Amino acid sequence: MSEQLTFHFEVDGDNFTSAGQASVMMKKNLRQLGISPDTIRRVSIAMYEGEINMVIHAGGGAADVTVDEEGVKIVLEDQGPGIKDIEQAMQEGFSTAPDNIRSLGFGAGMGLPNMKRYTDTMEIESTPGVGTRITMRVNF
């Protein structure tokens, strides 16, 4: 691929019905581009986890995805409450999701750890009261 392709998705907040639509659409786009199934799987998992986090914690946000010769870059950005302690939030099982969200089967504290696990690089910038920006990359 000699060119760079970009995709933009809005993520609705507090809407579990539409949660995951961006990752499903991106999965289709990557298949059409002939990207390997393993890369598609990794991108889909990381994006889905990020979307769910934006729905649960931030009232929505945006996902911007760039596909270039080297891989897939995913930028998730929201204007939610921010992450107070990123190191703690990265611990498997740590969650600030309320009980009503947990009763739906979400909020198990695996979102951020899974995002890191399935990407080659992940960087989190967050300011409490302002929002969060997560940049991930999955290399080919």
Regions found by a protein language model. Give the residues of each.
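Conserved beta-strand-loop-beta-strand hairpin that lines the nucleotide-binding pocket
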Residues: M1-F9, E51-F140
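Short acidic amphipathic alpha-helix that forms the conserved interface helix of the HATPase_c
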Residues: S44-Y48, I52
